[in-house]
Regions:
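Short, acidic Ser/Thr/Gly-rich low-complexity loop/linker segments typical of extracellular
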Residues: 51-67
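Signature of Gram-negative outer-membrane beta-barrel scaffolds
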Residues: 430, 457-556, 686
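A short, solvent-exposed loop/turn motif at the edges and junctions
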Residues: 51-55, 77-93
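Gram-negative outer-membrane beta-barrel transporters
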Residues: 646-729
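Membrane-proximal, glycine/serine-rich, low-complexity loop/turn segments characteristic
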Residues: 22-24, 88, 102, 119, ...
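Short, ordered, surface-exposed loop/turn motifs in non-cytosolic proteins
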Residues: 36-50
Length: 803
């Protein structure tokens, strides 16, 4: 009796387990890496087959981070087939049981196929737009028509990017945070952008453009984030790259000088040597990189006509001949303490020397009488030192990470200006010195935990920043400088922040929800003897949420919806109280009462892909409160114009961006980018306090503008590649005025030599010399038009060799 009862219980249990196992489904996940350098491999083919008869079950490709997920897998014996061009295909057996809903395979390492790599050159071009549609990635080496130039010049050709007045704009907005290797640095500006026109592109591997950052990024930068990724070799053993580029610009005079000034630069030389070394052995990777960019440029050649309601008409020219030498070097090591712990130590040094020789003549309406000649010499040295330490701990589960980092930056700005003021009846001589030492301390703690259908990201960050500045006027004879506006000022910034981000993903849906909380305290101490401004500051505690919802129609079509809230804090130079006299009669001054602007951004994007191309379209809107802009005004009994930053109220930016990429044939492919947007600045009224209080009132401004970029790439015989880039920028509104249309065409060719180790390139920018900047500014009681014929046409030739 008992024996029969026990037999029945066992049979029922077995049947129950069998039934449960048959209905059970499991999610398989893993992380694919390069076996040699441990870097994640995106876009790897992953196929699941049954072990019994090799029947295909399902398949996928790894994402941007090398991760893959296979859902709804029934318990059974299987094997994975992992393949990627240039790597040995790997077969891995796995057993999917019924006791867990989630099977983590951990890390799968792929070995490079040495035989394949020695016989052919592998060229795989990934989509610039990431699978999440929140980021665009561009390799510098693919930008043939701008090879050998600066980072700023390289960005001019990128989809969605425009360059105006030396600053990068994303979708018509220059409020961008620029990172180097994921960190803010003094080289590119904390909270703003600077120095991009002097960083050599030879030092850069790729550029990432993030239009919709998640909460793990700093909240600063309403237009988005640009991350500049420096070169770092990943091959085993000792290897490196050496390069040399030279060029010449300003091939002819586009617009003759006004009478009686020094000649403008012509046939300006450019020289850029570079060296990158790397040694990787077992658990140690050491790297060293040095680049030097020397340029002569006609930095500015602007012709201005000023018209006053109750005064004369003045014609003027601002010509600035510039010599620049920028040296940057980076050294460091990655130490894999064991399989789970890695320590990275690195240091960066940058030295930028700028010599400007400027001439600014002023004439009457018909240029028959010179009213004044302003000449200046600017001698500026910027020195940057940065030290970084980063520790990463990998838990047993793939993708389960703890990152701890510390970053210290020192940046010195040492400027000397010498002025000569020639008037019909007398001559004046003046000078001033400015010294600014910036110190920044950054600490971050980031934690990532994979979940069954996604992951959690959380962390904290602390920044402390101090910038004491001292400006000293050195009075000569017949001085016209505002000596009471000199003295000292000190900027202090403290920003602790905490964030959390949750990412969910299944077969059809993706969702991301994040929140960043920031406390900001800014204090700006001003010399009490300053004639206009007093000490000021502000503090706030604000939430910065972000959200993303995506629907995968199928493997080739996807729709994403984004929202985020961001802030743009005034940078120290925006509130700096000292007048700048590089233009003698349009004088720029900071404003300590300037406050942050806050932005709410919305975006709806769609991407469809096919075998040899893709199409991406996004509709976006930004609403900005407290818009930061520079306002120009005049004061009674003076023709001088003072340009001062102000908060101008609310503004709007709505638009549509499209990117179309297609390989037409084996030898020709295109990338077309179209961006159309509507800009609107509501009516506002502000008070400029310098040099005396005056009120400015502006009516509503709005315009429909945009830009088109067409990149044509040709793969020619004998391993020759060519690129032809056409850029058109439509008229747009700027503070108090408009900027006219601009267009240019760039051309570049390169040839692979020495079995792919060498590369020779030749390019020319703005080959028809058409990139001219025309502006119209309307103020109260005055207006002016300007046309800038600065140097845009440059021819370069260069050679790179990998070893």
């Amino acid at each position: 009796m008992y024996t029969k009862l026990i037999s029945i219980i066992i049979l029922v249990g077995l049947l129950s387990n069998y039934s449960f196992g048959q209905n059970k489904v499991v999610t398989i996940s893993g992380l694919i890496k390069d076996k040699a350098d441990k870097s994640a491999l995106p876009y790897v083919n992953v196929i699941l087959k049954t072990e019994k008869d090799s029947e295909f079950v399902t398949g996928t490709v790894s994402n941007d981070e090398g991760r893959f997920t296979l859902s709804n897998i029934k318990p059974n014996n299987y094997y994975l087939e992992i393949s990627f061009i240039g790597y040995v295909t790997k077969i891995q057996s796995i057993y999917v049981g019924s006791l867990s809903d989630f099977l983590d395979i951990a890390i799968i390492n792929l070995e490079k196929d040495i035989h394949t790599l020695s016989e052919v050159t592998i060229s795989v071009k990934q989509d610039e737009i990431s699978s999440k549609m929140d980021k665009k990635t561009f390799k510098v080496e693919d930008n043939i028509s701008q090879s050998g130039g600066s980072v700023l010049q390289t960005m001019q050709n990128l989809p969605g990017v425009t360059v105006q007045d030396g600053k990068v704009q994303l979708r018509g907005n220059d409020k961008i945070t620029v990172l180097i290797d994921g960190k803010q640095t003094a080289l590119t500006g904390f909270g703003s952008q600077s120095g991009l026109d002097n960083i050599p592109a030879s030092a850069i591997e790729k550029i990432e453009i993030i239009n919709n950052p998640s909460s793990k990024y700093d909240a600063n930068g309403n237009a988005g984030i640009i991350n500049i990724v420096m070169r770092k070799n990943k091959e085993e053993g000792f290897n490196g790259k050496i390069g040399f580029t030279t060029g010449i610009g300003s091939l002819w005079v586009r617009q003759k000088n006004l009478p009686s000034i020094r000649p403008q630069y012509q046939f300006t030389p450019k020289i850029n040597p570079s060296l990158s070394l790397n040694y990787r052995k077992k658990n140690l990777n050491a790297f060293f990189q040095v680049d030097n960019l020397y340029t002569q440029t006609l930095n500015k050649n602007e012709f201005v006509t000023r018209v006053y309601d109750d005064g004369p008409i003045i014609n003027q020219q601002l010509k600035r001949n510039r010599n620049t030498n920028f040296l940057t070097s980076k050294i460091g090591f990655d130490w894999s303490i064991n399989d789970n712990n890695t320590l990275t130590i690195s240091g960066l040094f940058g030295s930028e020397k700028i010599i400007d020789r400027g001439d600014q003549p002023f004439f009457n309406e018909d240029n028959t009488e010179r009213l004044r000649l302003w000449q200046f010499l600017e001698d500026e040295l910027k020195t940057t030192v940065m030290a970084t330490a980063a520790f990463q701990h990998k838990f047993k589960q793939a993708g389960h990470l703890l990152n701890i980092g510390f970053n210290y930056t020192f940046h010195r700005e040492d400027e000397k200006y010498f002025y000569d003021n020639f008037l019909p009846s007398k001559t004046g001589i003046d000078a001033f010195k400015l010294l600014s030492d910036e110190q920044v301390y950054d600490f971050n703690f980031d934690y990532i935990k994979p979940l069954k259908y996604g992951r959690i990201e959380t962390g904290i960050k602390l920044r402390a920043r101090n910038i004491p500045t001292n400006m000293q006027f050195i009075l000569g004879i017949n001085s016209i400088l505002d000596t009471n506006a000199g003295g000292w000022a000190t900027y202090d910034e403290l920003i602790p922040a905490i964030y959390g981000n949750y990412v969910y993903e299944n077969k059809k849906w993706e969702a991301e929800l994040g929140l960043r909380g920031e406390y900001v305290k800014i204090q700006y101490e001003v010399n009490p003897n300053h004639n206009t401004y007093k000490s000021d500051g502000y503090n706030y505690t604000q939430p910065f949420p972000n959200a993303r919802l995506a629907y995968k129609i199928n493997s080739r079509n996807k729709v994403s919806l984004f929202y985020n809230r961001r802030v743009d804090r005034p940078n120290e130079v925006d509130i700096r109280i000292f007048p700048k006299y590089d233009d003698a009669e349009i004088i720029k001054v900071g404003n300590p009462t300037l406050r942050p602007q806050f932005t709410n951004s919305f975006e709806l994007g769609y991407k469809t892909s096919w075998d040899k191309g893709y199409f991406y379209v996004a509709a976006y809107q930004r609403v900005v409160d407290g818009t930061i802009t520079r306002i120009s005004s005049v004061v009674p009994n003076s023709n001088l114009i003072y340009a001062i930053f102000q908060n101008a109220g609310r503004s709007y930016n709505q638009g549509i961006e499209m990117v179309f990429t297609q390989e037409i044939s084996k030898w020709y492919s295109i990338n077309l980018n179209l961006n159309v947007y509507h800009n609107q600045i509501n009516a506002f009224s502000v008070e400029n306090k310098y040099p005396v209080p005056n009120t400015f009132v502006a009516a509503k401004q709005e315009i429909v503008s945009g830009n088109i970029k067409l990149n044509n790439t040709f793969h020619l015989p004998k391993k020759i590649d060519a690129q032809l880039t056409a850029i058109y920028l439509a008229p747009d509104i700027i503070p108090q005025g408009k900027i006219a249309q601009r267009f240019s065409i760039d051309l570049g060719i390169k040839r692979s030599l020495q079995k792919g180790k060498g590369e020779l390139f030749l390019n020319a920018t703005d080959i028809f010399n058409t990139m001219i900047v025309k502006k119209e500014i309307q103020g109260q009681g005055f207006k002016y038009t300007s046309t800038d014929y600065y140097e845009t046409q440059v021819i370069r030739i260069g050679y790179n060799y990998k070893f």
